[in-house]
Regions:
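Feature responds to low-complexity, polar/acidic, surface-exposed segments characteristic
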Residues: 1-6, 21-49, 57-83, 93-124, ...
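Phosphate/pyrophosphate-binding loop motifs in nucleotide- or prenyl diphosphate-using proteins
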Residues: 18, 91, 165
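C-terminal functional regions that serve as terminal interaction/effector modules
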Residues: 167-168, 207
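Short, compositionally biased
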Residues: 9-17
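Generic structural marker for isolated residues within well-ordered, non-membrane alpha-helices
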Residues: 11, 52, 127
Length: 221
């Protein structure tokens, strides 16, 4: 991430701690410089497996969850298995019931759920995982975002992060770039959270760093 990037402090904060890394130079469009520095790909979407690794490491979870397989699609050969199991064991992360999606059949006798480690993570999912791992589960009654009412399944976690300045939204009156839907202003001109939108690597780094390492950003309360 270049210095002018608004995400630089967060990416740098996590990279210096060995929590996240990049991609070796030399791929198409990513030439090597004299130092052969890697590329971070800040605009690339982040997956559920990658999120599990970053959040688990940021929370300092280092226990061995054991050999038990918790998801049909995450066996011991999966590169994210340890981190996924650490979060799942604590109830910070979950999966999808087998048999609902056509390509996720139930396999007897365990009929385990599916994790979908390669699927893109959403802003709502990331908020839940980060807030849970950080122990931010205080009850709330206020509504910060137009599209996150108290009935939202992610309401508690989003409000816990938003109330501390760890996560923000988008000013009303615009258009959601991923869905194309308009985001009208309500009577209080509240921002929109866009909880179903996919998260980029840079956005995930910012939310994670704000929550677990707030000293990386002096503006965070």
């Amino acid at each position: 991430a270049p210095d002018p990037s608004s995400f630089y402090p967060y990416v740098h904060c996590l990279a210096c701690r060995g929590i996240l890394g990049g991609y070796a130079c030399g791929a198409p469009g990513e030439p090597c410089n004299l130092n052969h520095d890697p590329y971070f790909r800040p605009g690339a979407l982040i997956t559920r497996g990658q999120i599990a690794k970053i959040v688990s490491n940021s929370a300092g979870l280092s226990d061995d969850p054991g050999p038990t397989q918790m998801y049909e699609d995450v066996n011991s050969f999966n590169p994210f298995c340890v981190w996924i199991n650490r979060l799942t064991h604590r109830g910070y992360m979950g999966g999808y019931t087998c048999g609902i999606a056509a390509d996720e059949p139930c396999v007897p006798p365990a009929n385990m759920p599916y994790f979908r480690p390669g699927s893109n993570a959403t802003r709502g999912q990331l908020s839940k995982i980060v807030a849970n791992a950080a122990g931010l589960i205080d009850p709330h009654t206020d509504q910060t975002f137009t599209d996150v009412p108290r009935e939202s399944p992610f309401y508690v976690w989003i409000e816990n992060l938003a109330s501390r300045g760890y996560i923000g939204g988008y000013a009303c009156g615009g258009v959601n770039p991923q869905t194309g839907s308009s985001e009208a202003c309500d009577g209080q001109n509240r921002a929109w959270f866009r909880g179903a939108n996919n998260v980029t690597r840079a956005q995930a780094a910012k939310i994670d760093a704000n929550t677990f390492f707030p000293n990386c950003n002096p503006s965070v309360r």
